[in-house]
Amino acid sequence: MRKFCVYGKGGIGKSTTVSNIAAALAEDGKKVLVVGCDPKADTTRNLVGRKIPTVLDVFRKKGAENMKLEDIVFEGFGGVYCVESGGPEPGVGCAGRGVITAVDMLNRLGAFEELKPDVVIYDILGDVVCGGFAMPLQKHLADDVYIVTTCDPMAIYAANNICKGIKRYASRGKIALGGIIYNGRSVIDAPEIVKDFAKKIGTQVIGKIPMSNIITRAEIYKKTVIEYAPDSEIANTFREIAKAIYENENRVIPNPLSEEELDEITEKIDVLLKESVKG
């Protein structure tokens, strides 16, 4: 069983990436389980075609002793099993707690033994790698971590923070960084910036997602690109990324950048932004 986490700054395209990778793997005959660990609970929306009840919602309504696997696991496109951890009510509690509760409940209900997935994907918010959101790293629930980023300074800053978390917990177990997934949906499209960042922390850019209005159109209809436009170039891009991740053996403990090194990257981005304005 392959298990990996996808981290990244909020709004960076994690859920789009995860849902399309899951759809591509399912299309290839893999049995896939996706666990959405973002309080927005929208990771699996395009797989199922709607938002599903979250583990925390069901937990609050039924209580742990009355919960069943079918209350929290829903089947989506290609037979992908979908779970959403959910989050607390606004202004109350810790969002990361949903991750802990979801994973505990999946284990308690024997989800992994009953579903027997070939691949488990955790989609995790990465703006702040707090205790809850870092749980998959702490508990070694996954083998590999992939980080989605654009070339925006704050996205790279968040990616660097995630690398600090990976390095902290890698010494205690098997968790490692599998690579960076570059998303081209930014003010400027500068893959060389992200390639340079990846090289400096000691990893690879395992996939590049170009800007595509097909992604937006698919999401309007609550579908993955794999389902909505299976013959499109962007669908093939997601298939290539899914294959690269599934077959990847290039796992490293990253070397996070210093503040000075991050500033150097930010200065390069600033130059590119000024050039784009002149152009």
Curated annotation (Swiss-Prot):
Annotated residues for binding of ATP: 8-15
Reaction equation(s) it catalyzes: N2 + 8 reduced [2Fe-2S]-[ferredoxin] + 16 ATP + 16 H2O = H2 + 8 oxidized [2Fe-2S]-[ferredoxin] + 2 NH4(+) + 16 ADP + 16 phosphate + 6 H(+)
EC number per UniProt: 1.18.6.1
UniProt enzyme class: oxidoreductase
GO molecular function: 4 iron, 4 sulfur cluster binding; ATP binding; metal ion binding; nitrogenase activity
Amino acids binding [4Fe-4S] cluster: 94, 130
Source domain of life: Archaea
Matching SUPFAM superfamilies: P-loop containing nucleoside triphosphate hydrolases
Essential cofactor(s): [4Fe-4S] cluster
Annotated cofactor note: Binds 1 [4Fe-4S] cluster per dimer.
InterPro entries in UniProt: NifH/chlL_CS, NifH/frxC, Nitrogenase_Fe_NifH, P-loop_NTPase
Key words of the record: 4Fe-4S, ADP-ribosylation, ATP-binding, Iron, Iron-sulfur, Metal-binding, Nitrogen fixation, Nucleotide-binding, Oxidoreductase
Subunit organization: Homodimer.
Function: The key enzymatic reactions in nitrogen fixation are catalyzed by the nitrogenase complex, which has 2 components: the iron protein and the molybdenum-iron protein.
Family indicated by similarity: Belongs to the NifH/BchL/ChlL family.
Protein name in UniProt: Nitrogenase iron protein
Organism: Methanocaldococcus jannaschii (strain ATCC 43067 / DSM 2661 / JAL-1 / JCM 10045 / NBRC 100440)
